[in-house]
Amino acid sequence: MSAFCLGLAGRASAPAEPDSACCMELPAGAGDAVRSPATAAALVSFPGGPGELELALEEELALLAAGERSSEPGEHPQAEPESPVEGHGPPLPPPPTQDPELLSVIRQKEKDLVLAARLGKALLERNQDMSRQYEQMHKELTDKLEHLEQEKHELRRRFENREGEWEGRVSELETDVKQLQDELERQQLHLREADREKTRAVQELSEQNQRLLDQLSRASEVERQLSMQVHALKEDFREKNSSTNQHIIRLESLQAEIKMLSDRKRELEHRLSATLEENDLLQGTVEELQDRVLILERQGHDKDLQLHQSQLELQEVRLSYRQLQGKVEELTEERSLQSSAATSTSLLSEIEQSMEAEELEQEREQLRLQLWEAYCQVRYLCSHLRGNDSADSAVSTDSSMDESSETSSAKDVPAGSLRTALNDLKRLIQSIVDGVEPTVTLLSVEMTALKEERDRLRVTSEDKEPKEQLQKAIRDRDEAIAKKNAVELELAKCKMDMMSLNSQLLDAIQQKLNLSQQLEAWQDDMHRVIDRQLMDTHLKEQSRPAAAAFPRGHGVGRGQEPSTADGKRLFSFFRKI
């Protein structure tokens, strides 16, 4: 019994190895090394769960001590019969009475040996339980790794699908840009044709003016010839004063000519008054054209203000994009620093990462709101160009409803709706250009009226003072032509301003679309980075209890070996996995 107890005590003091612990025996002097139950409990305390194991062992020791105390009165008669030596010889004399202190010491040592054996058995069972737990945790770890691999494959497949969708959208946008370029070329061709017509009309007017000057010179030459003929007739009348009949005939002819000239004079005066009235009407039309020019200038100023506002919004979006790009660079630098660090992520760093993720989510929502505001601005421009107040109120109500749902997804403003709004804006601008074309026709009508006025002034050139009237008519015509040219110039400027505003608005919308695409790509990158960080922290959290459960009691009987090497090997094993 004592030898078996010594063997169990030796197993308790050896390392916790199930294969080699059963065949180890203590030498003869090993019984002196075991002193008391408290010393044995201190030697075999296990770091994995020292409190629970010590409490259980103390309870078992208390039960064993109570049982031994109850069995002590019957042990003295059993010990005494074992003292005689077995054999066939004569009975020996009784041995001398043993010392009771020595017996109590021996019994105490036997009790300690029994307790040590039971402690060794309990430690062996504990070691087996820990090995089973280790196998179960290893199995759970492999299952989780397989699940993470499946999720990784699913995320890769989604990324490929999204990449195909974005390529399709890019191709659609390229076709839209090509169509817009074709339309711009057509508009430029129309403008060139209008310029050619204008130059042709100016050339025709200059040619007509030259012909009018030639006709005036011929009329003056005819007038000179007529005056010379009158002088010749007067001389003839003086020469033939003697002949009364000829004188009477000549007198009658002269009276007829005077009457004809007086009638012609009255007709010219009537035409002059009509010309003055038409000049007044032309001045009224010029004033109306000036009013229209002022209206067009005000509209161009409004368009400039809208363009300036859109440029400011574009600058704000660019500034926010630069800020987000800087934050992404900061996150990548922090990620590189975290990957180069050898220590594991603490709870404080995880909290900071979660707070940074929340801040990034808030910034992403802000950028979505900015994209929605740009979309509302495009719709507001469309409604303003239509001049429909009800549409403006509808846009304001839609914007208020969408601002109430700020946590909506990025698909609240799809690329299709922006494209339709852009097409609406293009149609409105085209309709405005078409509305300006009647003014061009009106100017052409006024040009024909000026031509008619020139024809009427040609008739008035035969009056008594043809040079003054001709100069006045030429001055009026030049003023009318200058006003017409100024109006045409203002109209061309308005057209150019509208075209530049349209192109700048298209560029701003295209830049906002590019920013939204970059935002979605950045969101995907951030999701991947956060998933990778969560996976690393999860693996590290799983490696910590495994490292704590790894047996570190190998150096109790062989020497004090550092336990950090085992922990490092275990961390390297999980990193390889």
Curated annotation (Swiss-Prot):
GO terms for molecular function: dynactin binding; small GTPase binding. Residues 121-379, 443-528 form a coiled coil. A motif (CC1 box) lies at residues 116-120. Transmembrane segments: none annotated. One of its GO terms (cellular component) is centrosome. It is found in: Cytoplasm, Cytoskeleton; Cytoplasm, Cytoskeleton, Microtubule organizing center, Centrosome. The keyword Secreted does not apply. Residues 63-100, 389-415 are annotated as: Disordered. Residues 390-399 have a biased composition (Low complexity). InterPro entries: Spindly/BICDR_Dynein_Adapter (IPR051149). One of its GO terms (biological process) is Golgi to secretory granule transport. Keywords: Coiled coil, Cytoplasm, Cytoskeleton, Neurogenesis, Transport. Residues 69-79 have a biased composition (Basic and acidic residues). Its main location: cytoplasm. Highly expressed during early embryonic development. Predominantly expressed in kidney, undifferentiated neural tissue and developing eye. Part of a tripartite complex with dynein and dynactin, acts an adapter linking the dynein motor complex and dynactin. Interacts with KIF1C. Interacts with RAB6A and RAB6B; interaction is specific to Rab6. Acts as an adapter protein linking the dynein motor complex to various cargos and converts dynein from a non-processive to a highly processive motor in the presence of dynactin. Facilitates the interaction between dynein and dynactin and activates dynein processivity (the ability to move along a microtubule for a long distance without falling off the track). Predominantly recruits 2 dyneins, which increases both the force and speed of the microtubule motor. Component of secretory vesicle machinery in developing neurons that acts as a regulator of neurite outgrowth. Belongs to the BICDR family. This is BICD family-like cargo adapter 1.
